[in-house]
């Protein structure tokens, strides 16, 4: 990741989509080197450079390595975000960011982002797009997965069949989604912000788990996309889909955590790597 080039963008506009979600539209010269992805879970790495860092004096080409000689406190934090939409004609990228009050890096930045404010990013990456060969589609996640789920729903053919489950704090956090007529979108309420609700509404007890595991399983080959809080997804929903429902890895490869309650992204990445190594050792 350190050697990947950084694209220089700036904030074009912001808009609140819900109490806990802000859309930030990015544009500028960075689009000259940014190549959009065809995946509906396309993601970028936002690089938050302090205003007092003179980027023009850093080694070129500009990568994360360019910041290596700065004091630790001045090295930019990096956060992974899903691309909601790319408007190639307007040369703009829309990124929908979940707000967690004053906590975190991306949320406070998005809440206070101003037009013309610079931001650097790497990417995009991605690995999932709904397979038209599937008989039906199962999509599920919390707020962090809404951009990818929304993009996937829009990419489905008009005659697609499926179910989507999205866990949010409450009714005010629902946003408008476009889906084929035969794809049922279900909003699941947890009763509060994901990082603040009691333990009996999070992790192994997240309402999303019950919503997915109690829904009627449709006939035919399913293509699965499930992302969100890691404990709920990786220790509950992934075993349910792969083991209990017997869905082959080809059709259920995109089931993973986007974040983990009580951990920063740096801590989460470390935990996720350790989990992958442990799972690899059991096979």
Curated annotation (Swiss-Prot):
One of its GO terms (molecular function) is FAD binding. It holds the Pfam family SIP. It comes from the Bacteria. InterPro entries: FAD-bd_9_SIP, FAD-bd_FR_type, FNR_nucleotide-bd, Riboflavin_synthase-like_b-brl, SIP_C, SIP_fam. One of its GO terms (biological process) is cellular response to iron ion starvation. Residues 4-131 form the FAD-binding FR-type domain. One of its GO terms (cellular component) is plasma membrane. This is Uncharacterized protein Rv2895c. It comes from Mycobacterium tuberculosis (strain ATCC 25618 / H37Rv). The lineage of its organism: Bacteria, Bacillati, Actinomycetota, Actinomycetes, Mycobacteriales.
């Amino acid at each position: 990741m350190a050697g990947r080039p950084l694209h220089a963008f700036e904030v074009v506009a912001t808009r609140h989509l819900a109490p806990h979600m802000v859309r930030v539209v990015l544009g500028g010269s960075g689009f000259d080197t940014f190549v959009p992805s065809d995946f509906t879970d396309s993601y970028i790495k936002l690089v938050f450079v302090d205003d007092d860092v003179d980027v023009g004096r850093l080694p070129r080409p500009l990568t994360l390595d360019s910041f290596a000689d700065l004091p630790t406190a001045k090295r930019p934090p990096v956060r992974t975000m899903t691309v909601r939409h790319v408007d190639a004609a307007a040369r703009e990228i829309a990124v929908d960011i979940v707000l967690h009050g004053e906590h975190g890096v991306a949320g406070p930045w998005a809440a206070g982002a101003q037009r013309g404010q610079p931001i650097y990013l790497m990417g995009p990456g991605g690995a999932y797009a709904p397979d038209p060969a599937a008989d039906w589609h199962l999509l599920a996640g919390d707020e962090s997965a809404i951009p990818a789920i929304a993009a996937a729903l829009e990419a489905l053919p008009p005659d697609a069949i499926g179910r989507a489950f999205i866990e949010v704090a409450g009714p005010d956090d629902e946003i408008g989604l476009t889906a084929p007529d035969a794809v049922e979108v279900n909003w699941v309420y947890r009763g509060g912000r994901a990082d603040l609700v009691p333990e009996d509404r999070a992790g192994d007890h997240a309402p999303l788990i019950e919503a997915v595991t109690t829904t009627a399983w449709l006939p035919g080959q399913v293509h699965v996309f499930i992302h969100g809080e890691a404990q709920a997804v990786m220790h509950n929903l992934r075993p349910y889909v792969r083991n209990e429902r017997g869905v082959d890895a080809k059709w259920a490869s995109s089931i993973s955590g986007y974040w983990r309650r009580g951990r920063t992204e740096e801590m989460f990445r470390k935990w996720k790597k350790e989990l992958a190594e442990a799972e690899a050792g059991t096979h």
